[in-house]
Amino acid sequence: MSVTVKMLVDKVKLDVIYGDDDLLSKEITTSDISRPGLEMTGYFDYYSPERLQLLGMKEWSYLTKMTSHNRRHVLREMIKPETPAIIVARNLAIPEEMISAAKEKGIAILQSHVPTSRLSGEMSWYLDSCLAERTSVHGVLMDIYGMGVLIQGDSGIGKSETGLELVKRGHRLVADDRVDVFAKDEETLWGEPAEILRHLLEIRGVGIIDVMSLYGASAVKDSSQVQLAIYLENYESGKVFDRLGNGNEELELSGVKIPRLRIPVQTGRNMSVVIEAAAMNYRAKQMGFDATKTFEERLTQLITKNEGNQ
């Protein structure tokens, strides 16, 4: 997904001090944001001009203490044609030399009232989400009790129907059929729908339904962290499934591993309730409440007691 300066302006609510439509259409190619420190002293070795340049109180204060000549020299070196934009936080006054250099190099100048660290965090979060490499997987992504659950399985096994039942039970649909996943960092996986499929659910025999229109805004979500994967598969006699919940199967997507449960589909089983329980049980484990561990401790105590009575 490509991101332009205009998209960043709209998302983070920045004020455009200088820049027309052409300058705002410039593409941002990296989520890294630079806060020029040594560059202010004239040291430009290893400088990355392709990054957004963010100036806060420290950078601004140093600039204002320079002579006009030195300020003009530093800003002309710092602002390059490949720089997407220069951003000034805290509504600090824009030096004339900065506007002059931006006009010369064709760079937009943006401003925000937000403190520098918070502004940097907001922009990084947005750019990381947009510029991260996507992987498309087949399945249904649901938000169940605030936790992202990816439901997978063979075609026709009932993933979408299960998703619809979960929506009726008060949970939220994120994506159906195609889920675009990306790593926010080394340990966090996020998922979102393809734009053409947003809020839509395909039910065999019924067709495509608009969940937003039928069930309201509370039934959908634009994106979600993916924390648990559930694979639905047909029950076969003799096939071994985890009965205690102490399995450690994982699914790796975009370099991030998440736990995966395999749940057998059988006539008469209410899959939405089973998946709901699986999500709650996983969350309980994350909070330190492990029913499997409790059972094993009770079993050990019982065995020890029986051995003592012999």
From Swiss-Prot:
Question: Per its Swiss-Prot or TrEMBL entry, what cofactor is needed?
Answer: Mg(2+); Mn(2+)
Give the domain of life.
Bacteria
What is this protein's function per UniProt? Answer: Catalyzes the ATP- as well as probably the pyrophosphate-dependent phosphorylation of 'Ser-46' in HPr, a phosphocarrier protein of the phosphoenolpyruvate-dependent sugar phosphotransferase system (PTS). HprK/P also catalyzes the pyrophosphate-producing, inorganic phosphate-dependent dephosphorylation (phosphorolysis) of seryl-phosphorylated HPr (P-Ser-HPr).
Tell me about pH and activity. Optimum pH is 7.0 for both kinase and phosphorylase reactions. Activity decreases to less than 10% of the maximal activity at pH 5.5.
| Binding-site positions, Mg(2+) | 160, 202
Task: Name the gene for this chain.
Answer: hprK
Give the record's GO biological process terms.
regulation of carbohydrate metabolic process
Q: Where is this region: Important for the catalytic mechanism of dephosphorylation?
A: 264-269
| Protein name per Swiss-Prot or TrEMBL | HPr kinase/phosphorylase
Question: What residues bind ATP, as annotated?
Answer: 153-160
Reactions accelerated catalytically: [HPr protein]-L-serine + ATP = [HPr protein]-O-phospho-L-serine + ADP + H(+); [HPr protein]-O-phospho-L-serine + phosphate + H(+) = [HPr protein]-L-serine + diphosphate
Which sites are catalytic? Answer: 138, 159, 177 (proton acceptor), 243
Q: Which Pfam families match?
A: Hpr_kinase_C, Hpr_kinase_N
Source organism per entry reads: Streptococcus equinus (Streptococcus bovis)
